[in-house]
């Protein structure tokens, strides 16, 4: 059986067409790499991101919860591609495990999230995510995410 993914270059896919989240809550700009077990996605942090004006005005940094959201969106994209699904699916983040933060994510930085699928149990998926700065590869955050994917509740 030939999959949809055999006919396209995944780096040309537009995350905004695959995810239900939309700006200003869409945090994946591009898919950089994909194979059967991993995906790498990027997010450029422009100086006019809405959250920078309040977190923190004198030293703006991306809030940790939004770094986790970026990781969750990248995890959902990996799962969708593994399922050969390009139409938006509803995913629910149900647990974060051992998420640690190591460096600041400041305006002008591009982040890369490398996601590896660890396990699938029914409609529950566990991923390992490492978020790095693309310029110096410094680790920004690392942890595991567990989410529920409602494959029956596809958005059409």
From Swiss-Prot:
Keywords: Lyase. CDD domains: FabZ. It comes from the Bacteria. GO terms for molecular function: lyase activity. The keyword Lyase applies. Its EC number is 4.2.1.-. Gene3D superfamilies: Hotdog Thioesterase. Transmembrane segments: none annotated. InterPro entries: FabA_FabZ, HotDog_dom_sf. The active site is at 55. Pfam families: FabA. Belongs to the thioester dehydratase family. FabZ subfamily. PANTHER family: 3-HYDROXYACYL-[ACYL-CARRIER-PROTEIN] DEHYDRATASE (PTHR30272:SF1). This is Uncharacterized thioester dehydrase BH1850. The lineage of its organism: Bacteria, Bacillati, Bacillota, Bacilli, Bacillales.
